Amino acid sequence: MATKHLFLLPGDGIGPEAMAEVKKLISAMNEKLGSGFATDEGLVGGCAYDAHGAAISDADMAKAMAADAVLFGAVGGPKWDAVPYEVRPEAGLLRLRKDMELFANLRPAICYPALAASSSLKQEVVEGLDILIVRELTGGVYFGEPKQIIDLGNGQKRGIDTQVYDTFEIERISGVAFELARTRKNHVTSMEKRNVMKSGVLWNEVVTQTHKARYADVKLDHMLADAGGMQLVRWPKQFDVIVTDNLFGDMLSDIAAMLTGSIGMLPSASLGAPDVKTKKRKALYEPVHGSAPDIAGKGIANPIAMIASFAMCLRYSFGMVDEADRLEGAIAAVLDQGLRTKDIFSPGMTEVGTVEMGDAIIAKFLG
């Protein structure tokens, strides 16, 4: 069995505590299942700034580039609020995404049955929810040029951001969405604003052409992004895979996340293009939640999003679909048993800490 190389970047705040539970899981899989994982660990975010004066060092960046997959914890905290903008903790994640050319951000929105009552929507609206939002991550208004603030000289200023998409960017992100849909319910909804944006017109055209040429077996719908936001709240279970641009994906994925009852429960993946020779994609997996410095070191952080991110790693980087299914099933089973960390605790449940939750999930996974 070929060795599977993982590079771990726990980061700041609760990142190291959550990552510790994944490290235990990896060790258990190697020992009990012979999974063949090899791990190395580096610094990212504020801790990297403290050690190297940069949000990620060149040496750790090289290790990330060489790994089969990167597991990322969280970055940031008040300690680093005053550091220069270009070396702020978040710059480490941005460099990873840029240098690894991670253009496809996968954001699942899954409502675990045991937590359906925690959603702000009616239980029947969200129970059984399983949506995957595929967000284009390296183009659009966040990266388009010009991007500047101009002094107009009359006491007024003008802020400029530019929304830009080329055909190939839309082709490759829609291709990822269609391929993923084939492994799910075979349904893609593409969202843009073609009624007011030329980039939306092109997006609609290219997605339609890509579908016709290569993925005609997948059901395709188009929806204006603002209507999509409304429909996510009205009846989210109509969706399977949603593909959209960087800006709308940023907004819609957070809307979808809150349907589930706790944004702190959700994983994500960022994928690059397949290597020409190996056909493998560079990939980074991370929980959606932040570094939560207010609870760091207290042993109460919820490790589920980090563990679920590792499940995505098993599925998308290593093709270990059965193991990914079992791990996701173990998370659901532990929640069904009533175990809760502080952030998702409710009366009648059993409150546990970070380590206890991790141990319970690992035991259920291996059992």
From Swiss-Prot:
<dbReference type="InterPro" id="IPR019818">
    <property type="entry name" value="IsoCit/isopropylmalate_DH_CS"/>
</dbReference>
<feature type="binding site">
    <location>
        <position position="226"/>
    </location>
    <ligand>
        <name>Mg(2+)</name>
    </ligand>
</feature>
<keyword id="KW-0479">Metal-binding</keyword>
<dbReference type="GO" id="GO:0051287">
    <property type="term" value="F:NAD binding"/>
</dbReference>
<feature type="binding site">
    <location>
        <position position="254"/>
    </location>
    <ligand>
        <name>Mg(2+)</name>
    </ligand>
</feature>
<comment type="pathway">
    <text>Amino-acid biosynthesis; L-leucine biosynthesis; L-leucine from 3-methyl-2-oxobutanoate: step 3/4.</text>
</comment>
<keyword id="KW-0460">Magnesium</keyword>
<dbReference type="Pfam" id="PF00180">
    <property type="entry name" value="Iso_dh"/>
</dbReference>
<feature type="site" description="Important for catalysis">
    <location>
        <position position="193"/>
    </location>
</feature>
<comment type="similarity">
    <text>Belongs to the isocitrate and isopropylmalate dehydrogenases family. LeuB type 1 subfamily.</text>
</comment>
<keyword id="KW-0560">Oxidoreductase</keyword>
<keyword id="KW-0963">Cytoplasm</keyword>
<dbReference type="GO" id="GO:0009098">
    <property type="term" value="P:L-leucine biosynthetic process"/>
</dbReference>
<feature type="binding site">
    <location>
        <position position="226"/>
    </location>
    <ligand>
        <name>substrate</name>
    </ligand>
</feature>
<feature type="binding site">
    <location>
        <position position="97"/>
    </location>
    <ligand>
        <name>substrate</name>
    </ligand>
</feature>
<feature type="binding site">
    <location>
        <begin position="290"/>
        <end position="302"/>
    </location>
    <ligand>
        <name>NAD(+)</name>
    </ligand>
</feature>
<dbReference type="InterPro" id="IPR004429">
    <property type="entry name" value="Isopropylmalate_DH"/>
</dbReference>
<feature type="site" description="Important for catalysis">
    <location>
        <position position="142"/>
    </location>
</feature>
<dbReference type="GO" id="GO:0003862">
    <property type="term" value="F:3-isopropylmalate dehydrogenase activity"/>
</dbReference>
<dbReference type="GO" id="GO:0000287">
    <property type="term" value="F:magnesium ion binding"/>
</dbReference>
<protein>
    <recommendedName>
        <fullName>3-isopropylmalate dehydrogenase</fullName>
        <ecNumber>1.1.1.85</ecNumber>
    </recommendedName>
</protein>
<keyword id="KW-0100">Branched-chain amino acid biosynthesis</keyword>
<feature type="binding site">
    <location>
        <position position="107"/>
    </location>
    <ligand>
        <name>substrate</name>
    </ligand>
</feature>
<feature type="binding site">
    <location>
        <position position="135"/>
    </location>
    <ligand>
        <name>substrate</name>
    </ligand>
</feature>
<keyword id="KW-0464">Manganese</keyword>
<keyword id="KW-0432">Leucine biosynthesis</keyword>
<comment type="subunit">
    <text>Homodimer.</text>
</comment>
<feature type="binding site">
    <location>
        <position position="250"/>
    </location>
    <ligand>
        <name>Mg(2+)</name>
    </ligand>
</feature>
<dbReference type="GO" id="GO:0005829">
    <property type="term" value="C:cytosol"/>
</dbReference>
<comment type="function">
    <text>Catalyzes the oxidation of 3-carboxy-2-hydroxy-4-methylpentanoate (3-isopropylmalate) to 3-carboxy-4-methyl-2-oxopentanoate. The product decarboxylates to 4-methyl-2 oxopentanoate.</text>
</comment>
<dbReference type="InterPro" id="IPR024084">
    <property type="entry name" value="IsoPropMal-DH-like_dom"/>
</dbReference>
<keyword id="KW-0028">Amino-acid biosynthesis</keyword>
<feature type="binding site">
    <location>
        <begin position="77"/>
        <end position="90"/>
    </location>
    <ligand>
        <name>NAD(+)</name>
    </ligand>
</feature>
<keyword id="KW-0520">NAD</keyword>
